[in-house]
Amino acid sequence: MAQLDTLDLVVLVVLLVGSAAYFTKGTYWAVPKDPYAASGPAMNGGAKAGKSRDIIEKMEETGKNCVIFYGSQTGTAEDYASRLAKEGSQRFGLKTMVADLEDYDYENLDKFPEDKVAFFVMATYGEGEPTDNAVEFYQFISGEDVAFESGASADDKPLSSLKYVTFGLGNNTYEHYQAMVRNLDAALTKLGAQRIGDAGEGDDGAGTMEEDFLAWKEPMWTALSEAMNLQEREAVYEPVFSVTEDESLSPEDEAVYLGEPTKGHRDGTPSGPYSAHNPFIAPIVESRELFNVKDRNCLHMEISIAGSNLSYQTGDHIAIWPTNAGAEVDRFLQVFGLENKRHSVINIKGIDVTAKVPIPTPTTYDAAVRYYMEIAAPVSRQFVATLAAFAPDEETKAEIVRLGSDKDYFHEKISNQCFTIAQALQSVTSKPFSAVPFSLLIEGLNKLQPRYYSISSSSMVQKDKISITAVVESTRLPGAAHLVKGVTTNYLLALKQKQNGDPSPDPHGLTYTITGPRNKYDGIHVPVHVRHSNFKLPSDPSRPIIMVGPGTGVAPFRGFIQERAALAAKGENVGPTVLFFGCRRRDEDFMYADEFKTYQEQLGDKLQIITAFSRETSQKVYVQHRLREHSDLVSSLLKQKANFYVCGDAANMAREVNLVLGQIIAQQRGLPAERAEEMVKHMRSSGSYQEDVWS
């Protein structure tokens, strides 16, 4: 028998742990809820404090026969849930309600009435994990010993009365693609629930999420109509919200929200705990450009969280709450005929008691569009189609109908240009769509979402200050006449310009209300919160680490190296620390080059930085090529139980690195490719292979 080396032993241990996981169903290491994501009260509707957490009771009280649950991290799944609720109501007469999974308890789901239906719109987050708001529900429903009020066991098929529909949101560049919806579907089926139609799956990695959703929902509605004896009717717009102008109020009134995220912020008394529902208005204490070449800028910012009671750990994420650019706000208001009413005060209320108003109210049209609505996102075909009834003339209506019904035509005219809703309508006609109800715009557009960035500092070195590293997005798509500009990165660049003395910052021609609502962000402040990540250094600093981070993928690894240098300075035994970093040219976009030299001096031969410059030679060289060239080093460190980390592009780089690592293991150990692939998978499941990637 061949002698087992360290990596083989690690794999053997993982197999044993995996077996235990199978038989305990994760009881001892269930996915923890984000400790930084303290739940905040909903603005309207939902299961507020003091309200029932019994979904069946809630449906009976409000006369609903269809509940659409969502597990959402960035708002997309919530948006799809709202769209399904609206369509079910308008086309089929269903009495629908949208429900946040964390607002309810599920011990009585075995009493779900046979004449009702539940939808589950589930995003998969990170490495096959539930979104923050779905953690408790998922742990309950997928548990081996799931217990319902009736006391029935899984063998008794306790959910036999539950009819359900599922749609999953995922990204095929991640290993655990659609894990949530697939695992949920399996759990519900095991418990006897009856799925109606196919389990839908939308793929963000392939860029087909919207079309996947549209293709799935039509046969789903057919199946649901048959199962519940529904009759389709002509869909007529029925507002979910009432929007009324209030002439008794002006923007100067203290009761009016002008962009503040919460009542406390509006009243000038913000207080913690700060979370995804309640950001901290943090001062930016330093900002600079790491490089500025041609069409690209890269920012480094230091954000103070002193006095906020916010904390972070090295490897966590910071969320930046952006503001829409003034030019896009003006365009939107002009397209919908609201330019002259931008400062009119409006009240927004849910017509249905279960409707959750996504915007603080009262507010103004300008504030709603500038601070609360995702107006700069690519528009969906379905949303464009809903505007046909409100077109300014018949010719425009015919074009809108064609765009909404012809997938290829929409792709050619709208998707290829990455048009926002306002740009799409401007491409059809110069006439304003003044007849579109503002309620329809609130319903059809997502709430403006925070953007997450890998923290590029060590909490050990600077616990009250968070570093971020971000490339400013400004991209010209092939065939497009305009630049696609990142909402948040250009906002950050404007803040940097202002902080560094520019009296009128206008990155890529964009301007922002930098001082924020009622000048509350004056002095260069930005709303933030912190999100926990499992992307962490090993607890034993002597353990080797291999990091692969091209471009801004280097961000968390700056924090890792910063921390190891600090530990070494304290006399700790620090293990081999290897970074594979890639960029275009060493004299163009090699960020933190001087800083890394300092860390090299501090860590000596414990730190090795291996670079890949893709544009310096005729043959492009990427980090995966350097990884293969240093296969002996990689293999040696893996035998020493090294942790392996990847940060950056999921679609190409991360996939290639995963493939190359398997090839290195196979080559160095004389193993079949299939066995090496299994070893990489076991590294992932054990936590010794970690990714922080995006597409």
Curated annotation (Swiss-Prot):
Residues of the Flavodoxin-like domain: 66-221
Residue stretches making up the FAD-binding FR-type domain: 277-538
Intracellular or extracellular location(s): Endoplasmic reticulum membrane; Mitochondrion outer membrane; Cell membrane
Lumenal-facing ranges: 1-8
UniProt remark on cofactor binding: Binds 1 FAD per monomer. Binds 1 FMN per monomer.
Signal peptide, first to last residue: none
GO cellular component, as recorded: cytosol; endoplasmic reticulum membrane; mitochondrial outer membrane; plasma membrane
Positions bound to FAD: R451, Y452, Y453, S454, T469, A470, V471, G486, V487, T488, T489, W694
Sequence positions that bind NADP(+): R296, T552, S614, R615, K620, V621, Y622, V623, Q624, E656
Annotated FMN binding sites: 72-77, 123-126, 169-178, 204
Enzyme class: oxidoreductase
Enzyme nomenclature, EC number: 1.6.2.4
Catalytic reaction equation(s): 2 oxidized [cytochrome P450] + NADPH = 2 reduced [cytochrome P450] + NADP(+) + H(+)
Pfam families: FAD_binding_1 (PF00667), Flavodoxin_1 (PF00258), NAD_binding_1 (PF00175)
Entry function: This enzyme is required for electron transfer from NADP to cytochrome P450 in microsomes. It can also provide electron transfer to heme oxygenase and cytochrome B5. Involved in ergosterol biosynthesis.
Family that this chain belongs to: Belongs to the NADPH--cytochrome P450 reductase family.
Protein's recorded name: NADPH--cytochrome P450 reductase
Organism: Aspergillus terreus (strain NIH 2624 / FGSC A1156)
Lineage: Eukaryota, Fungi, Dikarya, Ascomycota, Pezizomycotina
Gene name of the encoded protein: cprA
